[in-house]
């Protein structure tokens, strides 16, 4: 969809501070240094974000875009991640939202604890922003949270504006600003909000406030751009089989707008962006993650996501350690997953990520490093709620190489050789006393089942009958 042609510019009544110099990204070029001038310049003017209501049957929509909560009392969380990277000033902003046990919208009463046992409840909004600084706002209540059953649309009101009624769905930007003092709303093509740090994270460098408005044009979902988009974890993700489930919603997009970070304004045009989500009873026991949308050495938009973890399968105490590498380049999707090949990893407790993968036709190698100390981020856990559980940086140095696979299994023609100094890197869970090295070890029966091509969405032609989230 041509977002600019379908929407009107949004007016901003608040006076804006001088913007950080982040010039329009009209042509790919070498990455700018991390330090950047704060003085405005006529040559760095950017386009305003534009708003359009989320269309039905939009292109590049992935399965599992919707909110998966089914209304039952089972332990449940859902989390969302949206990232914008600004190459011109080498800064990234990672927005993370979570809801825990939403059955208990006003928190748990004593009677609830007697019946269901103690649970952690609430809604959290976190941002890892410029210079790896952090902000977090949390409430134990989810009564002002909303999520669309079948589309990537959600929001929450922490504090309504002048006694206004909090929105219960997507609203135009001006209406949101008039009704919500502190909160957020996000769709596949629009994102806005304002949050204030609640003081619970003094152990990391903080900012006190963040405000943002930007529009997004999706470029990649999860699959070839001309094909039906894929479920990241296969068709079994439609059922509560894995703990947790995971879906990349937008492997790559281009975002335009502004972010005010503790009063400093960052403006951007066609900035690379990304979104993903997970849901279930709790996070994996241990995991690693690599993601990057800003590269040198390749033309067009390149998107990389690689991750692995130790997660529970089924109802028993069986665990598996799957790994995945997904690359979008020149409109094509290159997938390295357990049910079509192998993925190997060698991950240090911090500072070094090395992965390789192969499938029937291709080979890939990834190596990423960082000298940054990293910032502790929160994740929903069954044991303690939304607590520090992982460490991230957006200043990773990364090299991505991919080849065609020869008949003898060796490296053939090189398809991609690209580098970045803006990779997002993460390790989480634990323990991480030592490095973690291995090759994909997944249950053979599960691999055979997951690898079977099943279009789950086509089994539910009537939207009302589709499982939540699908």
Curated annotation (Swiss-Prot):
Coiled coil regions, renumbered to chain: none
GO cellular component, one term: plastoglobule
Pathway: Cofactor biosynthesis; tocopherol biosynthesis
One Pfam family cited in the UniProt record for this chain: Tocopherol_cycl
Tissues expressed in: Expressed in the roots, stems, leaves and spikelets.
Organelle targeting peptide span: 1-61
Cellular localization per UniProt: Plastid, Chloroplast, Plastoglobule
Top-level taxon: Eukaryota
Skewed-composition ranges (Basic residues): 22-31
UniProt-listed InterPro entries: Tocopherol_cyclase
GO BP annotations listed: response to oxidative stress; response to salt stress; vitamin E biosynthetic process
Induction info: By salt and drougt stresses, H(2)O(2), salicylic acid (SA) and abscisic acid (ABA).
Alphabetically ordered keywords of this record: Chloroplast, Plastid, Transit peptide
Feature: compositional bias, Low complexity: 32-48
Keyword Transcription listed: no
Further remark: Plants overexpressing VTE1 show increased tolerance to salt stress with reduced H(2)O(2) levels. Plants silencing VTE1 show enhanced sensitivity to salt stress with increased H(2)O(2) levels.
Described purpose of this protein according to its UniProt entry: Involved in the synthesis of both tocopherols and tocotrienols (vitamin E), which presumably protect photosynthetic complexes from oxidative stress. Catalyzes the conversion of 2-methyl-6-phytyl-1,4-hydroquinone and 2,3-dimethyl-5-phytyl-1,4-hydroquinone (DMPQ) to delta- and gamma-tocopherol respectively. Also converts 2,3-dimethyl-5-geranylgeranyl-1,4-hydroquinone (DMGQ) to gamma-tocotrienol.
Protein name per Swiss-Prot or TrEMBL: Probable tocopherol cyclase, chloroplastic
Organism: Oryza sativa subsp. japonica (Rice)
Gene field: VTE1
């Amino acid at each position: 969809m041509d977002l600019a042609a379908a929407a009107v510019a949004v007016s901003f009544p608040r006076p804006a501070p001088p913007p950080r110099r982040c010039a329009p990204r009209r042509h790919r070029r070498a990455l700018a240094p991390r330090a950047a001038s704060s003085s405005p310049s006529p040559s760095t003017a950017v386009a305003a974000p534009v708003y359009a209501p989320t269309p039905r049957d939009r292109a590049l929509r992935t399965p599992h875009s919707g909110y998966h909560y089914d209304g039952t009392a089972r332990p449940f969380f859902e989390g969302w991640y949206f990232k914008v990277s600004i190459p011109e000033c080498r800064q990234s902003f990672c927005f993370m939202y979570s809801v825990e046990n939403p059955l208990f919208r006003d928190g748990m009463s004593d009677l609830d604890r007697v019946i269901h046992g103690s649970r952690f409840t609430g809604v959290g909004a976190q941002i890892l922003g410029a210079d790896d600084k952090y902000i977090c706002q949390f409430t134990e209540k989810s009564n002002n949270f909303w999520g669309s059953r079948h589309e990537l649309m959600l929001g929450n009101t922490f504090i309504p504006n002048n006694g206004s009624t909090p929105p219960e769905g997507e609203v135009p930007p001006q209406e949101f600003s008039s009704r919500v003092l502190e909160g957020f709303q996000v769709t596949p093509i629009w994102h806005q909000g304002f949050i204030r740090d609640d003081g619970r994270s003094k152990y990391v460098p903080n900012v006190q406030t963040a405000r943002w408005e930007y529009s997004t044009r999706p470029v990649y979902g999860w699959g070839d751009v001309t094909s039906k988009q894929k479920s990241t974890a296969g068709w079994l993700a439609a059922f509560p089989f894995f703990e947790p489930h995971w879906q990349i919603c937008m492997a790559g997009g281009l975002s335009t707008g502004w972010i005010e970070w503790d009063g400093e304004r960052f403006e951007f045009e066609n900035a690379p962006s990304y979104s993903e989500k997970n849901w279930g009873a709790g996070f994996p026991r241990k995991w690693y993650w690599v993601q990057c949308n800003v590269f040198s050495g390749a033309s067009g938009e390149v998107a990389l996501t690689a991750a692995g973890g130790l997660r529970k399968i089924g109802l028993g105490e069986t665990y598996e350690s799957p790994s995945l590498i997904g690359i979008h380049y020149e409109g094509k999707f290159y997938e390295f997953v357990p049910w079509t090949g192998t993925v190997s990893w060698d991950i240090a407790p911090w500072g070094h990520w090395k992965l390789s993968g192969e499938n029937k036709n291709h080979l890939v190698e990834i190596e990423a490093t960082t000298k940054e100390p990293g910032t502790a981020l929160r994740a929903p856990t069954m044991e303690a709620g939304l607590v520090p559980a992982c460490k991230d940086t957006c200043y990773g140095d990364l090299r991505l190489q991919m080849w065609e696979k020869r008949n003898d299994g060796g490296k053939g023609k090189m398809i991609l050789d690209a580098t970045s100094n803006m990779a997002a890197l993460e390790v989480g869970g634990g323990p991480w006393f030592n490095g973690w090295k291995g090759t994909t070890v997944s249950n053979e029966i599960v691999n055979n089942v997951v690898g079977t091509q099943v279009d789950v969405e086509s089994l539910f032609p009537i939207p009302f009958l589709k499982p939540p989230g699908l």
